[in-house]
């Protein structure tokens, strides 16, 4: 079969890597891909912001399965369009992708269906923000309503800062059109958890849990990013908690979306805060997370194609997945200045030596390749990932590999999974 992956990041490299292991895949394409993906799939040019451009690639490939990596093509309606043309596509429709595309839609949906989440207010002007802040205690979370590549969330330490951040969002200077409306939220305390399920519109099958590290600096300091690393182990949550999350969060979401006429098929990513009051929803993503996909897929031992097709065909079951008991970790190596302004075009050295470390796979994110050498081409450059029988060994392998990679301005967090190893 012919499989097309849409996207160009570390998540897409991990998807390509896992799909390539399937004996059912005869030809693998990625559009647009990146320098590292080009070694494992045929890369095709595409503008992921333009639905016509994506459809043109579909017409060129005529895929038996399309896997959509990033959120933007989903919100443009790529699954609707491909399905209409008879090209099976994995992911939610444009209507169902509103769960991620609009923070205000998601919050109101959660309230309608009595799914636990933080108290909030939806505002469309600085005046509304100042009035709403009277009902909050600092710190306050300020979220841009629309898609902002993981950078539309700010934890304001004071109400004055919250009002200032909201004003910046409204102005369009901070996150463009994504900030025309903002959501204010109570700042929850606890450990964050990424809980992903596969859905066929009615049933769900949970994937193994993962924990992301959003802040750019060690000790969870500095601004939010798209994610600086993640890990996955058997012990993140027990079976009892997993079942609770399925029955009290994932299933009610899928059932609620169907009841509202927007059947949800694909991956539902529940970003949760495990608080003293119980798990609460921070956000939804309608696709595989990045960098969580990298450690999750390193633990997957069954055929990913079978599971994705089950979602499309309406026959998802937990038996679709077989998982390793090993631990896995991904450490993101980023360009100097990220998540702010950064330079690209820096030559990357040491990739072969890093990949030779036992249990390590280096996933490419922001890279390009020319004349046989790799160069930086984005903020998050590489996802250095490792699998081992226990978390400490996986972390040691990943950092040993990181130390072998060199490019001008490279930086990465030195404490991925550190809190988990202290428990």
Regions found by a protein language model. Give the residues of each.
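ATP-binding N-terminal substructure of ATP-dependent carboxylate-amine bond-forming enzymes
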Residues: 1-94
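Internal nucleotide-binding/catalytic subdomain
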Residues: 152-293
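Active-site "cap" helix and flanking loop/linker of ATP-utilizing ligase/carboxylase catalytic domains
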Residues: 246-268, 285-357
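Generic long, charged, amphipathic alpha-helical segments
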Residues: 344-383
């Amino acid at each position: 079969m012919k499989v097309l992956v849409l996207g160009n990041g570390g998540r897409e490299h991990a998807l390509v890597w896992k799909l390539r292991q399937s004996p059912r895949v005869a030809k693998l394409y990625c559009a647009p891909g990146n320098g590292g993906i080009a070694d494992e799939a045929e890369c095709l040019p595409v503008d992921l912001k333009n639905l016509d451009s994506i459809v043109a690639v579909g017409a060129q490939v005529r895929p038996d399965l399309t896997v959509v990596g990033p959120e933007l093509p989903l919100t443009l309606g790529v699954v609707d369009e491909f399905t209409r043309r008879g090209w099976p596509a994995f992911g939610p429709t444009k209507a169902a992708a509103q769960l991620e595309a609009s923070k205000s839609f998601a919050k109101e949906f959660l309230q309608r269906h009595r799914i636990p989440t933080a108290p909030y207010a939806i505002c469309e002007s600085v005046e509304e923000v100042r009035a709403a802040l009277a009902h909050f205690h600092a710190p306050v979370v300020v979220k841009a309503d629309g898609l902002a590549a993981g950078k539309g969330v700010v934890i304001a330490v004071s109400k004055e800062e919250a009002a200032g951040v909201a004003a910046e969002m409204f102005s369009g200077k901070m996150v463009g059109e994504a900030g025309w409306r903002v959501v204010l939220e109570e700042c929850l305390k606890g450990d964050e958890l990424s809980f992903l399920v596969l859905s066929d519109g009615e049933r769900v099958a949970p994937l193994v849990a993962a924990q992301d590290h959003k802040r750019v600096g060690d000790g969870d300091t500095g601004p939010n990013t798209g994610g600086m690393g993640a890990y996955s182990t058997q012990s993140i949550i027990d079976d009892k908690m997993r079942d609770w999350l399925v029955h009290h969060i994932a299933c009610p979401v899928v059932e609620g979306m169907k009841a509202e006429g927007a059947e949800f098929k694909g991956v539902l990513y529940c970003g949760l805060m495990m608080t003293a009051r119980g798990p609460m929803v921070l956000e939804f993503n309608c696709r595989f997370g990045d960098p969580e996909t990298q450690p999750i897929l390193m633990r997957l031992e069954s055929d990913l194609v079978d599971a994705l097709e089950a979602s499309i065909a309406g026959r998802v079951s937990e038996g679709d997945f077989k998982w390793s008991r090993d631990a896995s970790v991904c450490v993101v190596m980023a360009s100097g200045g990220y998540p702010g302004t950064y330079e690209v075009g820096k030559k990357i050295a040491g990739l072969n030596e890093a990949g030779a470390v036992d249990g390590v796979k280096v996933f490419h994110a922001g890279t390009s390749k020319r004349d046989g050498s790799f160069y930086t081409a984005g903020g998050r450059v590489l996802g250095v990932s490792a699998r081992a029988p226990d978390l400490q060994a996986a972390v040691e392998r990943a950092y040993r590999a990181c130390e072998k990679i060199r490019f001008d301005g490279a930086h990465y967090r030195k404490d991925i999974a550190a809190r988990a190893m202290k428990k």
